Every structure is written in C-alpha cells, then in structure tokens.
Amino acid sequence: MSKFKPIEIKEDGRPRDFEAFQLRLASPEKIKSWSYGEVKKPETINYRTLKPERDGLFCAKIFGPVRDYECLCGKYKKMRFKGIKCEKCGVEVTTSKVRRSRMGHIELVTPVAHIWYVNSLPSRIGTLLGVKMKDLERVLYYEAYIVENPGDAYYDNENSKKVEFCDVLNEEQYLNLMQRYESSGFKARMGGEVVRDLLANLDLVALLNQLKEDIASTNSEAKKKTIIKRLKVVENFLNSNLNSNTNIDEVVPNRPEWMMITNLPVLPPDLRPLVALDGGKFAVSDVNDLYRRVINRNTRLKRLMELDAPEIIIRNEKRMLQEAVDALFDNGRRANAVKGANKRPLKSLSEIIKGKQGRFRQNLLGKRVDFSGRSVIVVGPKLRMDQCGLPKKMALELFKPHLLAKLEEKGYATTVKQAKKMIENKTNEVWECLEEVVKGHPVMLNRAPTLHKLSIQAFHPVLVEGKAIQLHPLVCAAFNADFDGDQMAVHVPLSQEAIAECKVLMLSSMNILLPASGRSVTVPSQDMVLGIYYLSLEKDGAKGEHKICTGIEEVMIALEAKSLDIHASIRSVVDGRKITTTAGRLIIKSILPDFVPENMWNKVMKKKDIAALVDYVYKEGGLEVSASFLDKLKDLGFEYATKAGISISIADIIVPDQKQKNIDEAKKQVREIQNSYNLGLITSGERYNKIIDIWKSTNNILSKDMMELIKKDKEGFNSIYMMADSGARGSAAQISQLAAMRGLMAKPDGSIIETPIISNFREGLNVLEYFISTHGARKGLADTALKTANAGYLTRKLIDVAQNVKVTVDDCGAHEGVEINEITADGVVIETLEERILGRVLAENIIDSITNEILFSEGTLIDEEKARVIVESGVKSVSIRTPITCKAKKGVCSKCYGINLGEGKLVKPGEAVGIISAQSIGEPGTQLTLRTFHSGGTASTDLQDRQVVAHKEGFVRFYNLNTYEDRQGKTIVANHRNAAILLVEPKIKAPFKGTIHIEHAYEDVVVSVKAKNNEAKFILRKYDLAKANELAGVSGNIEGKLYIPYSDGVEVAENESIVEVIKEGWNIPNRIPYASELLVKDGDPITQDIIAGAKGTLKFYMLKGDGLDRIKNLKKGDVVKEKGVFVVIADENDREAKRHYIPRESVIEFDDSAFVDNPKAIIAKSSKEDKTIIAEWDAYNNTVIAEVAGTINFEDIESGYSADEQIDEATGKRSLVINEYLPSGVRPAILILGEKGKMVRYQLEPKTVIYVNDGDKVKQADILAKTPKAATKSKDITGGLPRVSELFEARKPKNTAVIAEIDGVVRFDKPLRSKERIIIQAEDGSSAEYLIDKSKRIQVRDGEFIHAGEKLTDGVISSHDVLRILGEKALHYYLISEIQQVYRGQGVVISDKHIEIIVSQMLRQVKIVDSGHTNFIVGDLVSRRKFREENERILKYGGEPAVAEPVLLGVTRAAIGSDSVISAASFQETTKVLTEASIAGKFDYLEDLKENVILGRMIPVGTGLYSEQNIKLKQQN
C-alpha cells in the first residue's frame, strides 16, 4: 500500500478516487472546522413567513440558502451573484444543495459523554479508566464522585484501606474524606468535566507497559481477562493512526478525551427536513426535536452558571444536558426513551442508520431507480427465448428521452417542447420512432423476491398492445413466476457498457443452466411436458400400424390424410439404420439437432427425459443451438397439448374394487393389536407404532392397486394418469388421495394421528375426517408464512458472510485436498460420488484398482465423461481440491473452485463465487419453505428398519465382532461398538502356507507371507486401507477400501485370502444395533445374480497371490466351490471391459470363452432365491440382554414407586414398567451376579418393560427388558430449514453429545457430585476425563475400546467438537453431508462447492493460543489473513510467530467479524461495529462488494474489475 493521505471531504465535490475509508473519533477542533456557525436558538422556521429563523436549527446564514442562488431577504437573486454574502441577512448566494452537506455546531457549556462509548459493551471510557460501567454512569449523571487525586486518604481509621485513583465514592464517603484529607491533596469531583480531565491526563504508553507487566505477573484467569480487555482498548487508541503498520503522517492518533463531546456537531438541515403538509401542518424529523432539547438545556445551563445558581440546580441541569445529548445519539439506550407529541419514542441518530429501515439498508444498499416500471405478467407463447412483450404505453414512458432525441434526429420535431407534444398526442410518427428506439435496446426484467441471479434477466423487447408484460414460458422456472397475478419490474440499461453487459451476459438465452447445480433451468414444464409426452406415447392396434415411412415428410402427409395415427408404431430409417418408432416420436426427432442419439428420443418422454435431453443439447451444441431448440420444443409441446385435448373428469378417478376388503383387514389387525395392548402384552408405544405401520402398508397397497388400475384404463391414456406419469402436474401420492385413501395425517407438532382418513376425495370425507384434514392444511399455510421469513434471513446472513469471496487467481498451488466419497445416510445414497467429483480438480492421482495404472493425474479437471470412467473403474473415494484447502491470499483460486456451474467451464478470475454460493443455498431454502403444504399435511415417514440386506456379492468378514448364543440357538450381537460386519471380495491370496507379516512404511503398507524357504511381498498404498475408526463407523466411508483380516504373525493356509476389498459394511451400533440376531456366520459366501454389464467373451480366472491365473474348466451349471474366482468380459480387441467376482455357491450360467451379446445377461446365478438378510432386530424396542449367566437383583425398582405393574389377563402374567417420571436420585437398574462374583449393572430408561423377576436365574443372551423406541414423527422440511440454519450458525445443539477426544479404553471412575466420571486410557499412556450429567444416557461400557470422535452419551454431535477433535477435513465431511441430507431429502440439488465456500468463510478466523512476539493477545479472534501477514512480518525480524487454532464461527458472527467496517456495520449491530471501528481508527480498503455498493462505486468483480482499464465500446453502424 502506498502512503495514504487523508482527504478532507469538501462540499464542492466528493473525491472520486479514494482508495480507503477510515473511521475516527472527531476532535473538538475538527468538529469546529466542519462547522459553518453555531446554532444558538432552538427555533426552526417562522410559521408565518415560513422562512428559517436566524441562528436557529435551519438558519440560512449557517447552512446556506433555501432556494438556489437566492439570499433570504431577496436582495441577490441571480446566478451572477454566486459567492457573494448578503450584507443584510448574511446568507451566501449559492446552490441550495449545500444545505445537505454544511454542518453547524453547538458549544456545550460542560463536556458530555458520548453514549456509544459509555453504554456499548465493553464500555470504552469505563475500561480505559478501570471503572465499572454502572459506576461510570453514576459519575456522569451526578450521583457519585470519582477520585482525581487520592493524596494520602484512607477509607478507615486504621489506615489499612487506601483510597485509589479513579475510585468511585458516594456522597457520604466524599464528605467524610474531604473533612479528613482535604489538606493532604485529596480531590474528587463528579460529572462530565472530571471524566474528560481524567481521560486527557491518561498516559497511554505508560498504561500499556503497566498492563503488559500485570499480565505477566498474574496467575488468575479472571484477572487476565479484565486486563486483556483494557489492553485491547489502549492498543486500539495507540494504533489508531497506523495503516497496515505504516504511519500516516498528517494524522494524530485518537485521544481518549475525544470520547467526551464539548462541541456538538449539528446535522445539515436537509438531512433532517421539515416538510410543509397541506393544511398548514408540518412533518418534522425527530432529530430536530432532540436538537431543540439540547439547545434549550444548554442555554439554560449557561444562564444559570452566569447567575451563580446553587450547585444542586446546576448539577441537575448538567445531568439533564447529558441526558438530552444521550437521547440525540441513541434514544432509549439508557433510561426511558424520550417521547414525542404522539407518545411514541423519537428516532435518534442511531436509529436512523440501523435496521432494515435505516440509512444503510434502506437507502445505500437498495435504491429506487429511474427508467423503470412494473406491470402484471401474462404468458407470451409466441416469443423467442430472448424476447419479452413490452406494453407500448410502458415503452413510451421508459424510452422517453431516447424517443425525444429520435424525433428530433428524424426531423419530425424541431424543439423538445414540440416533441413532447407529439408524444402526448401519440401521433403515428411517435410509434414509428419508438419501434426504432426499442430495436436493439435490451431491457431487464426482475421478479421479486430476487432470490438468485436468474431473478433478473435481460430480454429484447417486442412492443405489444394492452397493459401486461408478456413473458416467455420457459424462463418462468428461473423467476419462479406463474401467471396468477404475478407482477414484474422492467429496468432500462442506459450506458453503452450496461447495454453490452445485458446482451452478452444477462440475456435469458445465455442463462440456460442453474448456477446451483449446473442442471438446465429452462426445461419445459406442465402443458409442454404433457404435449411432448402425449406425442411420444405408443398405442397398440392404432391406425396405420407397422407402416414403413422413409422420413418425417411421409409421416406428416399420412397424418394429414388421416391414414396414420400419431401413436401408431411404425418403421423408419434414421442415419441409415432401420428402427421401430412411432409417428409422434419422429415429429419430436424432426426438431432435434442431428447429434442427438436415438436412445434419447425414441422412448416415452417424461419430464426427466426432456430435462436430460435439454442438458445434452446444451452440453453438445452450446448456447445458440439450445436456444432455438428450446423454442421449437416449447411450440411443439403447446401444440400437441392442445391437440391431445386432455381434460379431467370424475370418471378418470377410479377407486379400486378391493378397497373395502383391504380396509376391513386393516381394521381387524388394529383391533387385535388393541386387544394385545389391553391385555398388557405390548406397551403403548409399541401399540401406536404397530397401528401406524398397519395403516401405512394398507395405504401403500391401495395406492399401488389404484395406480395399476388407472395405468390400464384407456390403455394408458387416462388423463389423470398421463398428467402424473409425465411429470406435468400431480404425483402418485396426490392421485392416491383422490382415488385410494387420504391416509394418515399429522398433528401440528409432527406426530401422526393414529386414525387415518379412510375416504378419498372422490368418495368425499365425513365430518370427522374433514376436521382432521383441516388440521394439517392449516398448519401448512401458517408454517409457510413463518418460514419464508426465516429462509430470507438465512439467505441474507449467507450473502453477508460470503460476499467477499471471489476468484482471485488461477492456481494457488495447494497440493492437499479433501478425500470424498458418496454421502449415505442409513444405507441410502444421498449424493453419488459421480455427482460430487463432477467439475472438480483432482488433488491426487487416481489409480485404477485393477491395473494399478494412473487413470487421471493430479490437476485434472473432471468432466462428465471422466467422472463416469472413475466410477466405473470401481474407485470409491477421490481426493479433490476444495475452497476449504485453498491457499489463495484472498478469495479462492479457479482450480480449487472448479467448474462455474452456470456455464459449464472452469471458473474465471473475477467471478463473484461467494454471492453465487449464498444464493444457491438460500434460494431453495425459500422454495422449500414455500412448499410444505403440497402433500396437504399427510404424514410421510419411512417404514421402521428391521434388518440389513446385502446388495452386493462376496463373503462375510466379522471385524472385532463377539456373539452370544441364546436358548433358541440364535446368534446374538454382543458388541456395543467398535465392530462391524463386512462384505468383501479377495484381493490377494496367500500363495503358500506361512506366517503373515505387516510393516507400515511412510506411504505404503507391506504385507508379506513367509515360509521356511519362501517369501512373498505385496505393497499396498496406506491411503487405500480402511482405518480402524472408519471400520467402527466414526468417520468416512469404507466401501472400496482394503481390509487385512489377519494381524501380524498369524499363520495362514495356502490360498487363504489375506487382503480384501470391502464391498459393503455395516457397523455396530449405527447400522446393526446391539442384541440383533445375526443370520450369517463369519466367512459365509453371499451370492447375487451377476449381470454382465458389457458385451464380449467370458474368461474365468482364479486369484493366485495378487495376480489372476486363467482357468478353463468351468462350464454352464457348475457351482463355484473355491474363493477367488473372477470372470472377465473381454471386448473384440481382447481388452478387459468388465470384471466380476463370483462367490462360492454361485451357479455359472455360461461356458468358459462363451460370447455374451446382451449386457443384461446373467453370468452367474445366486444359489438363494430370496434376498440375503445379514441381521434382524426388534424394530420397536431397544433390547437389554444378559451378558453373563447369573442371578437377577433389582435396584430402585419398586412397584408403585418407580415402576407400575401391568397384568396380562389371558395368562395372568405380571410385568413391571418403569415410570416415565422418576423421583430425583432414583435410578432403576437390574444387576446380575455372575459366577466368580462378577457383577454387571444395567441402567433402565423410563417406560422400560421388565421381562424378569428379582432373584431369577438367567442364561447368557436372555432378554431382561425392552425400552420402546420413541413414537415416530413425520418428516417435514421444518426439521430441514432450522437444521440448515443451526449448522450454518454453528450453534451448540441443545442436547450435545459428549465425544471422546482420544482413542482408548473406557474406564468408569467413582462418580463426582451426581455426575458420572468416565476416563479414557490411550495406549501411549495419556488419558482424558469426562464428567457426565445424570440426565444423559451413557452409551459406552466399562472396558470398551473407543475411537476419537465417537459419542460417549446420546445427543447430537456439535460441529465445534468435530473441528476440535477430528480437524477441518472431518468437519468438511460432516457439515456437507448433514446439509446435503436436508436438501436432497427435499429433492433439491445443490453442488457441494457452494456449501464449501460458506464453510471456508465460517473457518476464516483463528483463535490465538500463543502470541509469540506479535501484537496479538491470547484469546483474540483474528482473520487468517491478518494472522499470516503479522507472522510473516515477525519472522522477517527473526521473532517468535504466534500460534493459533482454527475456530468455527456461525455465519452471523463471521459476517460481523468481517475485515471491512462498512460491510459489518450494514449487516447487524451497527452501533457496536461503528463504536469499535472509530476507536481503533479502522481502515476499510474497499476490496469487497458491499462496501463499494454503499459508497456507490463500481463493484470489483466480473466486468467491474476492468473499470480501471478504461475499455471503450465502439458502436458499429
């Protein structure tokens, strides 16, 4: 940075070329130098003559003339007298706009504290003087004395307690001390003067050194904190004239006494206007009233002092003056707010700048613009993609100046006046000129709410009659517009540059892709989809079936001649190939570009297929082809939707015949369950869950039957079915409400009402059903209103935190990346690997797991083709560069960001990626919330999980798994954690019998098998091996990773598999709960039908070591008996196309070397008919089982006290149920006394049902008790939006889980004050101790091994803990998967990179742990950039750098902590931000978007970066 010079802002012109902006405290001299005179009188204007009073608040002499170039008395009245001061009235003759910039001042008789520096925490004045804020207020408001000079004064007679400097005394103490010590120099005063003097006499440098010594010498943390607080304020004052550590010559640092006001500046009068209303009344700005009070009190005080009034009166007046100034600056901050005539608080200067209606947000960030208008929109189906219909009336107004010029230029009018008259009379020449003006001049359309960049797009206007704007149907999705009365605003770009940007960047035909996901946004919807779908349907036995047509012309002729039905199946020739298709599909083909393959159009075209088609055309053909294609598609869709004549009739809604039967069956089941409950066989929770499950499955069966019926009706041409099936409108769920049953409904709190609505809308609902329905529907509407506000607020916070992220460089040179894999939740894939790596840059080479060759090297940009190759090659995790690991000094670099999804190319420097990310996340947030009630409040939850099923083939491996066998001989899981069941295939087999050895090198792991005279070594990459914490399910994914089943030194047999690839994994307890029943044994083969997946020749191989040996003796019908059989499908060049592992017990379906011509053929069949279930468990309860055999002892379990008895009437069996609410200190438990005195204790939850009696003998794995799982609640985005908000705000969740910080073995120590004490012992001898509240459920057992990051108790994991314990990359994985789960659950696609940008901003500050020789203070939060710069500076001088740890800030905190003052102030907590900035003399280098918008400059992104280079645009005529 060059040396800055402060620029004085003069009224004649504001400086255009300033580089930075600094906020400072103004000294009294400075305030006086701004002022044009002192305001002495509280008068405003003379109410008779309406002229401002002299020396009053609107005085023309001080502030300038009221009318341009006219003095007040009217002596000088023309431009020629400019600059003359009138002798009579003293007014300078100049323009009246100086009244917006000239300030006055009021000389206060006594210094007054500025309320911001007293009352805004931490109180700056109080902190500097070391006085509490309350005490300081007492001094300032004349209630207490402050010691100026303690002399030798003591509080007590024994002289033990000395009076210190700046002590605060009450009246009594003061009088007492004055009596005794006045002679020894004791002095104390009260009020503003003494505070000002104290501040003026502070020696800041000495204070700074003193405080630094104090810090070094104190050990108390609390004291340190207070000293550090003071130190910060002192440092801020001392450094307030530094800029990046270089002095600014002409500037003195801020002085503490400037926080006291002696000269009060008066705001220029036009900024606090007084407007005459009709009827002789005046609207006056509140600030004027507040100033009047200050002036009144000040003059009164002056008079009283001249009269030598009694001290007490003067004091009172001074206090009132202080209060008046307080009210002016921040009304209501201290005592009660000053109220105006109409009983509402007056708006002070602080209120004027803060809040939504304040100066920042209302006038600086959002301005009204001219050349704009708004009107209702209607559909314009005849428009081209880049056109909009503009009403002639609007165009006439919008283009008026252009039109006037054009009329003169053509010679129709000679003067402007004449031209205006022509326009008013709307003569023919006017319309002719208007057409010419509008041609080639784009306009911008905007629909509020503007949620993302596609809410403002440019169009070429087409003049239309009428008053409504016409909009192209395909851009509605981007604007989220419909035609039920929506309005849109039109803006006219004026400058050549703006017009060029509209044409090149903003034209709607250029914005085909959605920046959030890279999918196309201009996809046909509703009618258009219906038309295209109808066109592509096929009908058996239609007229003209099996005709042969050479091309589209013949088809059209046949259709015209009515000799061919549009749905008839015909044969035709396309690209020289004979194909079977339908007439309608050939019509679709006729509008497609030539490069579209047959499989994209020769099928039934539903909405998804059309979207894929549009995407494909854009990717292959580019913008121009897409735009014209989309227009043809639109026309075709509308034409055939009309010709199809699809309508809805009640007869289309078909109710299944067997509905009543199904319902009666369900009612019967419900009655049975109700009876079991009455008999006490099941708990109330189980009853509720089971009933809901019954109704859910009944509903599903009915819906399925109904869909089948409607599908068969009219051979698939049922109108309602077509609408839903094509994706035009409606869904299966909605049709089933019309025709099957309305189903289960939810209460407003989300719980499901157990009586479903059995009727459907066709039959009609009865009164009760109708009432239950309204319940859900109203909740939907109420929610919508509330949530829109929340979503909008979230968007605003995201924008504010990310607005300064832009692409600054091409490559930051970072080599580290983040390893990513597919995101799954409970075994459901939420986001595939392919989607996640698309458009990203690799951070490490990708190695083909089969051939060990490098597929793609580091630095490759992954496009769709490469992403497909990577996923097909079986790679399960990829390391990519992300904004979080980007090393760019500011912003991000192109390589770490990847593709700009809006255009599908690598992002260019200057792109405002932060704003785009914030919009991409915020926009669907609003969308989601606006759409809760579409399912009409019907409940949607998944059926309870009861089992896990293998989806792939291989064999079973138990990892760390222990099991029990129960009395029925079932295998029961005995682990609570740190165990898993893996499904694997062999990767390396032992070539001979020997001992296995495993050595860990830096990046490799060497596995060797040693026999007497033989040794085989295999080298694996460490990165490919599954880590222990991944196997235990703590972090990351294990599929595709390698697993070594043996430990070092174990003997293995020949051909035993020693390294395996994990195909699927189910960890305990996340995927398989404790006490589940296992249905497989260790080593069991799992077979599935194996599908070829490619055409080619089959070759069978056997794994030997790590290579494949050819085996030729396998033939059709053989059963595989050995581990390690692989089949390879070789293409015509004898290259491997596909490879599959064939597990034991599979049946081979082809001979060796046979040719497979169908990629869907089954090569090997599963030996089992049904699917393979790995484990099963009780879906409704958590089971407690006996771990040892022994005798039962009850503890704190008493019937009628902590438990209740339930009696089964049929069997007379009694069982105890623990009460829901227990007395304090009562902790029911079951103890088992085993052999050898071993005791095991089971803590019981409320509502647990006990299955054993006190004193019973039990066997291992017997069931002791069951706790019902919580009653199911309906899923709704309500959980979604607050969840997203909670994650972005990094809030600590209410019930945070306690998390292990180290790997180790759990030990329970003796409890401490009703808290459980858990100690984790690590292998290296270190340990960590946790005290856990009794209210939390502990999830670990004594002696268990636990990994860092695992939960010790129940609850939600806090993202702060993830960052602290597992680091930034784990946080990246956690936040992205949590946020994506919410959005994908709603079917919203957002690219990961947008979330990453926000997360990187949440991590942009670090916390200083050790300050070294830097200027930082321990515990400071500083931005990474400042931290880096300061450390570089210190290292240059050979000093000790500071050490810091990453912290996660919520988006609000991160936005307020922005390095830019203006940006932070305009976000939230305006007064606080400005207070801090003014004391520290903070600089704002105007690097980012928001501050430049506020100052009205070009914003430094995109085309704004080139503004310095003065590019001029030439117009070609």
From Swiss-Prot:
GO cellular component: DNA-directed RNA polymerase complex
Annotated transmembrane regions: none
Known cofactor(s): Mg(2+); Zn(2+)
GO biological process: DNA-templated transcription
InterPro entries: DNA-dir_RpoC_beta_prime, DNA-dir_RpoC_beta_prime_bact, RNA_pol_asu, RNA_pol_N, RNA_pol_Rpb1_1, RNA_pol_Rpb1_3, RNA_pol_Rpb1_3_sf, RNA_pol_Rpb1_4
SMART domains noted in UniProt: RPOLA_N (SM00663)
Residues annotated to bind Mg(2+): D482, D484, D486
Cofactor note: Binds 1 Mg(2+) ion per subunit. Binds 2 Zn(2+) ions per subunit.
Coiled coil: none
GO molecular function, one term: DNA-directed RNA polymerase activity
Protein's job: DNA-dependent RNA polymerase catalyzes the transcription of DNA into RNA using the four ribonucleoside triphosphates as substrates.
Assembly mode: The RNAP catalytic core consists of 2 alpha, 1 beta, 1 beta' and 1 omega subunit. When a sigma factor is associated with the core the holoenzyme is formed, which can initiate transcription.
Family per similarity comment: Belongs to the RNA polymerase beta' chain family.
Name listed for the protein in its UniProt record: DNA-directed RNA polymerase subunit beta'
